[in-house]
Amino acid sequence: ALDFAGGTVVHINSGVAGLVAAYMLGKRTGLGRESMAPHNLTLTVVGASLIWVGWFGFNGGSALGAGARASMAILVTQVAAAAAAFSWLVVERVVRGKASVLGGASGAVAGLVVITPAAGFVGVGGASVMGLIGGVVCFWGITALKRLLKADDALDAFGLHAVGGMVGAVLTGVFYSDEIIKAAGVVLAPTFAGQLWIQVEGVSATIAYSAVVTFIILKVIDLVIGIRVSADDERMGLDLSQHGERIE
């Protein structure tokens, strides 16, 4: 399967693992009764900005050398992130009546995730479309799909990373550039449909592997030391209860 920088092994894997962990851990105390909205959007924007810039190294570095392919990977990473942030904000405005800073940051991350498997295989046009699609689908992932799954996925690991990784991995088989593929010496399936099916198989295998292995690992940890802190520690916050410090 085509996966340039880890759309399957990093994002689908971690997103599915997060969902399994959320089910096994259970919901946070007070969820649904207390406001749990992000309380420091300044840190959110700073963090998203650092991730955005760092992703250039993540995707560009997967070319394993400074050259045309690395440059294109960095360019399409920027394009996809911007396109996804835009489409996310548009959908958010339509659905909720207003766009938000948090939405813009989430949309950018969605675009970064979506382009990860495709960064070394697509051009600017393909990256733009993938970003636009990814922003919309990931918004659905953290809203309607999240409600359907009924999991307390606090950081939207599944809705952003797993869903975004799935979208990116499948669309890589749709929007790859023949010119870039040939220049890189990548061997594809004999037909377009065949390559697309390989992408779907890769996604499915990653989901199954991650879900099973995560369940086994967490089950063992739960039997040995447990995977959830006490209710008092949870309310106090893990920074303070586990480490004796807190950043206000």
PLM feature segments, named:
Residues 1-248:
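Glycine- and aromatic-enriched membrane alpha-helices
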